[in-house]
Amino acid sequence: MSEPMSERERWQLELDKLQRGLQGDPFAFLGPQRDPGGEGGVLRAYLPGAQRVELLDEDGATLAELEQSDPGSGLFQRHLERLPPRYRLRVHWPDGVQESEDPYAFGPLLGELDLYLFAEGNHRQLASCLGAQLTRHEGVEGVRFAVWAPNAVRVSVVGDFNGWDGRRHPMRRRYPSGVWELFVPRLGEGELYKYELQGHDGLLPLKADPLALACETPPGTASKTCAALRHEWRDQDWLARRAERQGYAAPLSIYEVHAGSWRHRDGRPPHWSELAEELIPYVRQLGFTHIELMPVMEHPFGGSWGYQPLGLFAPTARYGTPEDFAAFVDACHQAGIGVILDWVPAHFPTDAHGLGRFDGTALYEYEHPFEGFHQDWDTYIYNLGRSEVHGFMLASALHWLRTYHVDGLRVDAVASMLYRDYSRKEGEWLPNRHGGRENLEAIDFLHHLNQVVASETPGALVIAEESTAWPGVSRPVAEGGLGFSHKWNMGWMHDSLAYIGEDPLHRRYHHHQLTFGLLYAFSEHFILPISHDEVVHGKHSLLDKMPGDRWQKFANLRLYLSFMWSHPGKKLLFMGCEFGQWREWNHDGELDWYLLRYPEHQGVQDLVAALNRLYRELPALHARDGEALGFEWLIGDDQANSVYAWLRHAAGEPSLLAVHNFTPVPRQGYRIGVPQGGDWDVLLNSDAQAFAGSGAGSQGRVSSESCGAHGQAQSLVLDLPPLGTLLLRPAG
């Protein structure tokens, strides 16, 4: 039978763990260690590199000097007859003196309810629980760090404040949650930090904080301590009316923006304050109701455009601080503009400092690559079936909606979440527990997300980028749907762009590409998206997709935008498309603003402003976007002339007539049936000279004739402009 260890042998063993970075329970050895049954005990501090350590009372008076156990060991200790209830340490370093409370003198930090809710996946305020929280604990100012790493042997917080030495601040493990915590006294705002984790297989790369509220400016990858948002909001009027403004009967016209490449200042990307000064007035001038920002969550690689984020709770430092971003959102609201953020719960990048293999195991991702790795994007896939990951993503969504007052989230790559075999060959995916291809865990998450958002942030939008025929994407969960407020109409986008790209002489053979979308236009609450994805990677800009010579390209573009704005569905247009940029979008540059010196480009911009004005002002164009009663075909079968015409309706409002001529041939005396006799006003002619068009086609006021056509008792005889749209409504 072996002899019991002596006290010196015991602390030598513990010291060895500290020196080797294997101390998983530092509070059992460091700080005040009370003698059994007494008031005295040993006080220990591990401070490698320190020369002297003095023990001070809470008023700063010296009580004793701690002795270094062995020269150069870094372990300072002293047995005291009475352990002080409060004390500080004065540490003499080779380059100066530091005075602070002892991190290992404080009790547990997180409450059991916080840990329970986190483990359950239902902690709605996770951003104020885990991560780095500036706080006052037991009367002392400092930062409380907390991170989930259940399979780590040891976790330390490292930063400039401890020379990035993982031996200095090992953390306390909280069982059974797997959360590690530590309060670092006197630490303040703006400190860079990461976590050093010891896994079962050895030391891991330094990890950024998954719940950091702020981050270092890339290419730096550290997290940054950040106070809770202090912004004084002035958007109460906007929030009070948001549910009405964003209802299905309201106009929704979205300007999609990549913040870093909209407009540069002195050759650099803009600051949030500069965007507030320039972007907001621009959006108001053009009449858009909302700005949709491509992901602003911190992301290491700018070339991902934000779609491979790692800081799910931190606005990117590229454009300013969290306070600056909040001020931008507030300014949008005060200007009557909503803000939607793109948000990515489907996958995350493999950067070493990120979430992948966070504690040496597949923590945030699935273990098996057939489930946990996306080969198209070289990214990990979130394991949303794990309650802690489910709760982490849910808390991220709520953080942006509640903390930053954003008005909606556009959920990226939903199709990749719904199907286990998405973009995989046979034999490269694992079925669900029923043997099917549906990702049941992701579906459960989307149900929960949409229900919680509807309950906790009324009126907020959750929009799905979903490219398959999954039924009921925008149907309520209670009715068997996924619960999104809207769905991008990817089918309409692909078909309409394919059609408009055809030579006008050949469009008669592709007539169905514009009529087909109306067969399912009311099956979901759709948004018609012309997004960034359509103007990159060799797809050409929207203007350059158009066939023909220069005049025809501009006419086609004006026609296409007019067709889009008169078609059922809410609207989304990517920046640069509104004035006909020739080049594809370049995320490293800025839009080609100089083009607005040319009348054709200015004409396109003026047309978009006119379309948005009509769209907002005329209920017929927006009130029944998702209802079949809001739409009536007049001409869908004139394949020979490539002409389409329809009526848009709203209860108690005049109907609106839209007529589109997709050939460069002017159609003189074209008869179209209308439901109402009398005079009709031409509200918009896309070929008007005001839009740098030729000025052809009907303008002003036209009178009906008592000659039935297209199932209507009355009709109008119109001159259709070449490659043009007419929008009309009854006069008066």
Curated annotation (Swiss-Prot):
Question: What's the source species for this entry?
Answer: Pseudomonas aeruginosa (strain ATCC 15692 / DSM 22644 / CIP 104116 / JCM 14847 / LMG 12228 / 1C / PRS 101 / PAO1)
**Alphabetized SUPFAM superfamilies for the sequence:** (Trans)glycosidases (SSF51445), E set domains (SSF81296), Glycosyl hydrolase domain (SSF51011)
A single GO cellular-component term on record? cytoplasm
Keyword Glycosyltransferase carried by entry: yes
Q: Which SMART domains match?
A: Aamy (SM00642)
Know the name of this protein? 1,4-alpha-glucan branching enzyme GlgB
| Family label | Belongs to the glycosyl hydrolase 13 family. GlgB subfamily.
Q: Which gene encodes it?
A: glgB
Q: Could you tell me which InterPro entries the record lists for this protein?
A: A-amylase/branching_C, Branching_enzy, GlgB, GlgB_N, GlgB_N_E_set_prok, Glyco_hydro_13_cat_dom, Glyco_hydro_13_N, Glyco_hydro_b
